[in-house]
Amino acid sequence: MALTKPKKIPRYRRNKPEIRKVDKGIIHIRASFNNTIITVTNVLGCVISWSSAGACGFKGPKKGSAFAAQKATENVIRMVVINRATVLITGCGKGRDAALRVIHQNYIPIHAVLDVTPTPHNGCRPPVKRRI
């Protein structure tokens, strides 16, 4: 059985992403060394929009760069209009400051910036270091 290719839709007929309005929102920034993921939720925690460096077209080690985090944040902000935002930052990657800078440059009123990176209080024993 032969597979049929889906028809290509011309650019002028493609659906444009709809802009969603939120009164109070939470912007979650997860910045790891390998990627940066930005998620916008409402106060209840329902996801409104999200983007990541990988979803923006960056591959390999470029996903962990500050520029990739900047572009991912711009993609999310383009989809959402927020009247008041709380920013929760997790992780210690290069995209932390870049994403926060983009939010500030786009005139989104920031209510609070919180660092919620999990830190152990001497919990699990770390793995043994490799000897090469």
Swiss-Prot record:
Q: Which GO terms describe its molecular function?
A: rRNA binding; structural constituent of ribosome
Q: Which InterPro entries match?
A: Ribosomal_uS11, Ribosomal_uS11_sf
Q: Which PANTHER family match?
A: 40S RIBOSOMAL PROTEIN S14/30S RIBOSOMAL PROTEIN S11
Name of protein: Small ribosomal subunit protein uS11c
Q: Which SUPFAM superfamilies match?
A: Translational machinery components
Keyword terms, alphabetized:
Chloroplast, Plastid, Ribonucleoprotein, Ribosomal protein, RNA-binding, rRNA-binding
Q: Which GO terms describe its cellular component?
A: chloroplast; ribonucleoprotein complex; ribosome
**Subunit details:** Part of the 30S ribosomal subunit.
Gene it is expressed from: rps11
Q: Where does this polypeptide localize? A: Plastid, Chloroplast
The family classification in the record reads: Belongs to the universal ribosomal protein uS11 family.
GO BP terms: namely:
translation
Question: Pfam families per the record?
Answer: Ribosomal_S11
Q: Which domain of life is it from?
A: Eukaryota
